[in-house]
Amino acid sequence: MSRGKAVVLDLETTGLNPRTDKIIEIGALLVEDGEILDTFSTFVSPGRKLLPQTTEITGITDEMLEHAPVFADIAEKLLAFLGEHVLLGHSIISDYAFLKKALVNEQPKGFAFERNGLDTLKIARRFLPAEQKKALSALTAYFQIPHEPHRALADAQATFLLYETLWDLYEEGTPSAFIPFPLHYQIKREVPVMPKQIEQIRRLLEERGIPCDRDLSQLTKNEASRLADQIRSGVIKAPSDE
């Protein structure tokens, strides 16, 4: 059975929830039959300051994102790179969910981003002992694969090498474990922030002496409503009040 062509994908994000968190880095490899044909790598502006724990986990800082494009500016180039290829990742459904949400909200109404996937986490769970940790960093250490964790392109490269290792070890005996499967994630297209919401948030921030740490124009309508509620309730407050 041929490995075929696929895009190895890894994202760094502001958190774990695709409905509320944002992509901050994309790393992808176009591969075929064990060879890397092309790469795609970019930072992405989330439109807001990073939380300290995000920087601690990813190593990505606000300064690194200062001149990064917003997702809308790289969406078409990314789509061209992805083509209709199978998506390969470690816990691929998580990255697929973030990517689908971002793409659906930037493309014309009716756009569908449906793909098949391969998951090194799923494959590892099938063949490795239960006591063996299955995080990407744990598996690369287990198989002695070079890896600089928590940066998108480095994680994509490590995932590719992990897949190649798993293929060499287990594909001949269990080829069914390496058959792509449909990825499923339901996402509702979001409504962009309304101008009156931006004005309202700016007024609330000014009244309370709170600095604006995000690009309000990048919010969705629901995000703007949540932000206004957080300001009113005191969840978000001026630095002098903390």
Language-model segments: which ranges?
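Conserved non-catalytic scaffold segment of RNase H-like nuclease domains
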Residues: 1-115, 129-150, 176
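Active-site catalytic microenvironments for nucleophilic, acid-base chemistry
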Residues: 102-105, 126, 142, 165-169, ...
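A short, structured active-site edge motif that brings together acidic residues
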Residues: 112-124
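Acidic, divalent-metal-coordinating active-site segment for phosphoryl/phosphodiester hydrolysis
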Residues: 153-164
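Acidic two-metal-ion nuclease catalytic site recognized across multiple nuclease folds
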Residues: 162-242
